[in-house]
Amino acid sequence: RPPGFSPFRIY
């Protein structure tokens, strides 16, 4: 997972 990964923002 990248350092800016957020489970609330999945593209």
From Swiss-Prot:
Keywords: Amphibian defense peptide, G-protein coupled receptor impairing toxin, Secreted, Sulfation, Toxin, Vasoactive, Vasodilator. Expressed by the skin glands. Disulfide bonds: none annotated. Its main location: secreted. The modification Sulfotyrosine is found at residue 11. It is found in: Secreted. GO terms for cellular component: extracellular region. It comes from the Eukaryota. GO terms for biological process: defense response; vasodilation. GO terms for molecular function: toxin activity. May produce in vitro relaxation of rat arterial smooth muscle and constriction of intestinal smooth muscle. May target bradykinin receptors (BDKRB). Belongs to the bradykinin-related peptide family. This is Phyllokinin. It comes from Phyllomedusa sauvagei. The lineage of its organism: Eukaryota, Metazoa, Chordata, Craniata, Vertebrata.
